[in-house]
Amino acid sequence: MSWLTPDLIDILLSILKAVVILLVVVTCGAFMSFGERRLLGLFQNRYGPNRVGWGGSLQLVADMIKMFFKEDWIPKFSDRVIFTLAPMIAFTSLLLAFAIVPVSPTWVVADLNIGILFFLMMAGLAVYAVLFAGWSSNNKYSLLGAMRASAQTLSYEVFLGLSLMGVVAQAGSFNMTDIVNNQADIWNVIPQFFGFVTFAIAGVAVCHRHPFDQPEAEQELADGYHIEYSGMKFGLFFVGEYIGIVTISALMVTLFFGGWHGPFLPPFIWFALKTAFFMMMFILIRASLPRPRYDQVMSFGWKVCLPLTLVNLLVTAAVILWQAQ
């Protein structure tokens, strides 16, 4: 097999790694929906889904079958093309955002020198999906939910990006692998604690998760921008939301908690355990916090998160300049 050159083998292995990592992310996002319902049942002193399979283990399969056979309905006066594209853009952008996350020293889909900027770009692209969904549905509740979601996401992406600049300044690179290697001695969560707090809050808001789920507030907007979606289109939005949680959790681990670094266990196991911990924290937050008003969410972002990120960035810059002297 003379055509099987070393360069071609490297390319095929890279493609295989990318496919495996992205499939694992999609699977984790899907299974998180089942895990969330089980954990919410535990937190609220009830059973949760336990009828399909042993202990409810096949509930996810039942949900997938139900969603697959539901009518793929499109509203009569909607923009059919944009209405169909919106869930695809949402799912794809959130999945591609995970591509820059290194799960071990040798396993990463795209080891980009502008990794953090690529993530912020994909997070911004997801806003278009929400706007497209709300506008193309020709529904006032969808449009209001899309306007809420876009304003909230764009606002908190500012704090999300600023909270990462301290980490970038310390590592001297936008590359995620370089940032992880820079945490071999001390995790960034210690010198960048306020940056981590702001990133965690902004990450929950960007994912539209409770308590920042005003764009989907059932009591006010009847499920917001995807009220008109059903079948697999709704499934793409649904799984995409959980993929966003997986991505934000993985970024917390990579940027602030040493990535794959840890004693005794293999690097991938450490990364998976840390990521699973933060995924559970998302669920715990949903189970324990009330939903504030929309104006309170926006006010909190601009009056609390923004000053905190700016102070953190200024202090980090001052410390780096002092150490350089």
UniProtKB/Swiss-Prot annotation:
Q: Which GO terms describe its cellular component?
A: plasma membrane
Transmembrane regions: 11-31, 81-101, 114-134, 154-174, 186-206, 237-257, 265-285, 304-324
Broad class of enzyme this protein falls into: translocase
Chief localisation class: membrane
> Which Enzyme Commission numbers does its entry carry?
7.1.1.-
Where is the protein situated, by its record's location annotation?
Cell inner membrane
Task: Please give one Gene Ontology molecular function term for this protein.
Answer: oxidoreductase activity, acting on NAD(P)H, quinone or similar compound as acceptor
Question: Where does the signal sequence lie?
Answer: none
Stored Pfam families: NADHdh
Describe the family membership recorded for this protein in Swiss-Prot or TrEMBL: Belongs to the complex I subunit 1 family.
Q: What protein name is recorded for this chain?
A: NADH-quinone oxidoreductase subunit H
Q: Which organism is it from?
A: Enterobacter sp. (strain 638)
Gene for this protein? nuoH
